[in-house]
Amino acid sequence: MAGQQKSVTLRFLAAPMDANVRGYVGGGKILEWIDKAGYAAAAAWSGHYSVTGYVGNIHLHRVVNVGDMVEVEARVVYTGRTSLQVVCTVTSHNPRDQVRVTNTQCLLVFVAMDSDGKPTPVPPFEPEDDWEREENERAQVLTAVRREVDDAMALQVYSEATETCRETLRFLAAPTDVNWGGKVHGGYVMHWIMTAGKLVAERYFHGHARATYAGGFRFYRPMYIGDIVEVDARLIYTEGPEMHVSVYVRSGDPRGTELQTTTHCTIVYTARDEEDGEVPVRPWVPRLPEDRALERHAVDLIEIRSRLGRNEPHEPHAD
């Protein structure tokens, strides 16, 4: 029954096929898990199919190792008229020692849809304990911050007038990428974004880079099976060991000529040495006007997000 179940927990072992080329489970796969758990919680509370609108403020604290027992807990913390905000917490442990670590925590926004694909009202959520009250209040603060970030993003130009390190992936959305609504799964889109961003970071650094923060995946429109997909990633800012990479996803009918923007995110990667310690990267010094504007934009986003005031997870039932 809608409005009754407010949390869902997925439990499973991280499999060898989940690992990246470095042998551990990277941020892209973790985001796939998060999107699935978040969808389950949103659908259970709303009683409707729900689409991902936003996934953000993602601090990737620790990697998941192959063979770890993984728990992805998704909890509804706030509702609007047709939207739901869900906090997802990912923890993992080696089954042989039971020492649990928190890998990441983030906020997702879903919109409930009726049978005609239109937004539909959801049952109101009322927090019942200290953790829920704090997350409910924080969700409202994050909504205001997202609007400020959206306004800043709308002013930026991404064209061919650039000298930065840039990579573009192109492929067709396959039937295996489908979600429960017949469109491309948002978790897979996030995985593609993380892959393209990592490619740019490692090409620029000429070494290993790990995703440590994602500033917000914004989903503007759905993507369909059979669409041609273009994932365009470019470096926009460096500081110390950090490389800030902006990624746009566009898609469209391969028989047509125009691709439409479906998703955008900015990801922070850190350069790592052979012992997995952080090392500085050579500074990116932009010369062209567009590149300089995007560098200023990255600095502005850092300032806006600094007001969020929390980098560590706030685990459920920790109070």
Positions of the model-derived regions?
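Catalytic strand-loop segment that frames the active site of acyl-thioester-processing enzymes
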Residues: M1-G26, F125, A139-W192, L199-V200, ...
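Hydrophobic, helix-prone linear segments
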Residues: M1-E73, V99, D177, P283-R287, ...
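Hydrophobic beta-strand-centered segment that forms part of the acyl-chain substrate-binding groove
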Residues: A2-Q5, V25, G38-Q85, T91, ...
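HotDog/MaoC-like acyl-thioester-processing domains
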Residues: G3-L10, V64-V66, V77-R147, I225, ...
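Hydrophobic face of alpha-helices
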Residues: L31-D35, M190, M194, H244
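Generic structural detector for well-ordered beta-strands
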Residues: R11-A14, H59, V109, R170-L172, ...
